[in-house]
Curated annotation (Swiss-Prot):
It holds the Pfam family SpoVG. InterPro entries: SpoVG, SpoVG_sf. The keyword Cell division applies. GO terms for biological process: division septum assembly; sporulation resulting in formation of a cellular spore. The keyword Nucleus does not apply. Belongs to the SpoVG family. Signal peptide: none annotated. This is Putative septation protein SpoVG. SUPFAM superfamilies: SpoVG-like. It comes from Alkaliphilus metalliredigens (strain QYMF). The gene is spoVG. Could be involved in septation. Keywords: Cell cycle, Cell division, Septation.
Amino acid sequence: MKVTDVRIRKVAAEGKMKAIVSVTFDEEFVVHDIKIIEGQNGLFIAMPSRKMGEGDFRDIAHPINSDTRSKIQDAIFAEYAIMNEEVQVQVQVTEEAL
């Protein structure tokens, strides 16, 4: 299975949740609501989940092995880095215009 598209919706700069992502596989299947979260050891992805009860969350969709998780995470972080670069360029252009 190959990641064929990553779409990122930026969330507010402050807070632990940095973005919400949709990932398309083989141009045939999409998983929405993957979150990019900043933890104590850096950024990580959280698969879409549903609250089950007293603070328990259960993944709705998730990779079955660590290799697949790494492929998904690498594709998401690569697109997130590109998006952050574009935002930085826009901020610099705006600041220079002022």
